[in-house]
Amino acid sequence: MSSLREIILDTETTGLDPRQGHRIVEIGAIEMVNKVLTGRNFHFYINPERDMPFEAYRIHGISGEFLKDKPLFHTIADDFLEFISDSKLIIHNAPFDIKFLNHELSLLKRTDIKLLELANTIDTLVMARSIFPGSKYNLDALCKRFKVDNSGRQLHGALKDAALLAEVYVELMGGRQSAFKMVDKSAVINNLATNQVNNKTEQTTIVIKPTKEELQKHKEFLSRILKTAY
């Protein structure tokens, strides 16, 4: 049986439209194999080489001053592309993130880099609209519907929102009991502290039904992401 690798991905930006000069300021991506979080992630804050509009700052709390010493996109592009590889991307409102990522990639002017394809994404916003017509579909509303603890989400954040989306996605696919197995999350937590990408480490997936203890460990893991993502 072949493994299904998926990447839960989110970005934060300086605004709504890259055609108006807006840029990505944070990328958070979490690896899932056969609906199991492996503990591997990619997370970087990025210097957008421009100011931070107050409207965007109010949403994610990332200031221009904070981003001054952060890497430029071109310095992390290869690591990012290696991490996502050709895996399916799970994104909430995928067209938004894909247009920004492709804008950043196009600015590199490299013939060896292909732009990302929207066809290679699963849009959880579209899924939610199909399953729950007439309801609210933002991440907070879906967390509330599925009883996912998002109490630490006062502001948006790419990595912590990707972690929440991972839970929501599993619920949209049928729920924890049918798909969500637990693994050790220490690698993710360590990466949060060091802002490093760990895309070389192989980890063993434990294929079992989640016990109450494992589900509690997952809640604790999610809580730590929400508290330490900034």
From Swiss-Prot:
Disulfide bonds: none annotated. A divalent metal cation 2 binds at residue 10. Keywords: DNA replication, DNA-directed DNA polymerase, Exonuclease, Hydrolase, Magnesium, Manganese, Metal-binding, Nuclease, Nucleotidyltransferase, Transferase. A divalent metal cation 1 binds at residues 10, 12, 161. Substrate binds at residues 10, 12, 55, 60, 161. GO terms for biological process: DNA replication proofreading. Its cofactor is Mg(2+); Mn(2+). The active site is at 156 (proton acceptor). Its EC number is 2.7.7.7. Coiled coil: none annotated. It comes from the Bacteria. CDD domains: DNA_pol_III_epsilon_Ecoli_like (cd06131). SUPFAM superfamilies: Ribonuclease H-like. NCBIfam families: dnaq (TIGR00573), dnaQ_proteo (TIGR01406), PRK05711.1 (NF004316). DNA polymerase III is a complex, multichain enzyme responsible for most of the replicative synthesis in bacteria. The epsilon subunit contain the editing function and is a proofreading 3'-5' exonuclease. PANTHER family: DNA POLYMERASE III SUBUNIT EPSILON (PTHR30231:SF41). This is DNA polymerase III subunit epsilon. It comes from Rickettsia conorii (strain ATCC VR-613 / Malish 7).
